[in-house]
Swiss-Prot record:
Pfam families to which the protein is assigned, alphabetical: HTH_15, MerB
Enzyme Commission designation: 4.99.1.2
Keyword Lyase tagged: yes
An example Gene Ontology molecular-function term: alkylmercury lyase activity
InterPro entries: MerB (IPR004927), MerB_HTH_dom (IPR024259), MerB_lyase_sf (IPR053717), WH_DNA-bd_sf (IPR036390)
Record protein name field: Alkylmercury lyase
Domain of life: Bacteria
Xref: NCBIfam families: lyase_MerB, PRK13239.1
Family according to the record: Belongs to the MerB family.
A GO biological process held by the record: response to mercury ion
Task performed by this protein: Cleaves the carbon-mercury bond of organomercurials such as phenylmercuric acetate. One product is Hg(2+), which is subsequently detoxified by the mercuric reductase.
Organism of this sequence: Pseudomonas putida (Arthrobacter siderocapsulatus)
Reaction it catalyzes: an alkylmercury + H(+) = an alkane + Hg(2+)
Gene3D superfamilies the UniProt entry points to: 3.30.450.410
Amino acid sequence: MDKTIYSKKIAESLSSGNHPEEFATLFVTLLRQLVMGRPVSREALGTALGWSGQRVATVLEPAPGTEYDEQGNIIGLGLTLRETPHVFEVDGRRLYTWCALDTLMFPALIGKTARVTSRCVATGRPITLTVAPEAVLQVEPAETMVSLLTPDASPDIRCSFCCHVHFFASPSVANAWASTHPGIELVPVENAFGLGHLIAHKLLEDSERNTA
């Protein structure tokens, strides 16, 4: 796997290839709002960005997986207030992520350390991590693996990518699962973190370029 090419594909898939630099700016800002543990209105997001409501809507529209509450506030896009198998605790606030890789890349985007609790998708064994912006500080079991898949052309990255990206308690368990799931690549947590770090920095670079 060429990590640079792969990270670029993931970053592009997040925005469905549309307005990639503007989307990166919106995405990073939205994550930093969601990590406060509250729904984010489009108005509040626009204020944080210094954008009009129409510009927010235009950039957000190509992301079909965006989650909203009954009042139309944003409650999830990668990082979510809705329960998933991946618990992502920051500053004592309990949030969730769509997939295993999110837990490894979001600390770099929000600039905070996260305590992650998940389970092996094959055995149900608990998996815990402490992930800082620059390193994985702790992982249990130590041999935890992550499954990866190259996203297809679908605009919905949650279905085309996130639903296939899991934690596994050991290489043997991961290999057994992958044998019945074509196209899957398995990597140790540290390698997955390195990939997530590249994706995060690509998004941060795009965001900074858009606001320069």
